[in-house]
């Protein structure tokens, strides 16, 4: 029997614009109305002077900066039947029934350069450690085509390749 996953990931990302002064300050809270947070784990929260913590049994408060990168948290919930997720930030608000959140992103656009908050479910435990894929990538008719590969792990770390050059 299928059991709905109770692990919710909330991610904020993006920048104000390219270049200097691109920082985006995220200040807000995420409430899980009608549910209890059983456990919360931070993602890409390395600045200990910035707040990202659980408040009471149903809310996470945060004060973060992104400059094109991302941060966020995973929350493992209990008693979530009929619950909602209420995201309230200095850049916008979003309220969604938890029953409407699946493995695909539910997004709050916040302007800027790919600036947004994404909410989605993840498996309670992820047994997958490999991926194989094929992509069709349009190439320029002449000259070099530098391609980069970026791998993002579940815990938020990223690894970038050097450019891989394809040419016709």
Language-model features: locations:
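C-terminal functional module detector
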Residues: 3-168
């Amino acid at each position: 029997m299928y059991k709905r996953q109770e692990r919710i990931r909330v991610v904020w990302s993006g920048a104000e614009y390219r270049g200097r002064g691109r920082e985006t300050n995220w200040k807000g809270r995420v409430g899980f109305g009608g549910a209890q947070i059983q456990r919360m784990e931070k993602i890409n929260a390395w600045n200990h002077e910035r707040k990202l913590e659980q408040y009471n049994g149903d809310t996470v408060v945060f004060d973060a900066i992104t400059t094109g990168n991302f941060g966020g948290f995973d929350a493992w919930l209990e008693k979530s039947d009929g619950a909602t997720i209420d995201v309230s930030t200095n850049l916008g608000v979003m309220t969604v029934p938890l029953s409407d959140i699946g493995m695909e992103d539910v997004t709050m656009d916040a302007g800027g350069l790919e600036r947004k908050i994404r909410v989605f479910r993840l498996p309670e435990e992820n047994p997958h450690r490999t991926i194989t894929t094929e992509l069709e990538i349009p190439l320029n008719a002449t000259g070099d085509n530098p391609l980069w590969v970026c791998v993002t792990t579940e815990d938020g770390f990223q690894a970038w390749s050097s450019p891989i050059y394809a040419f016709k």
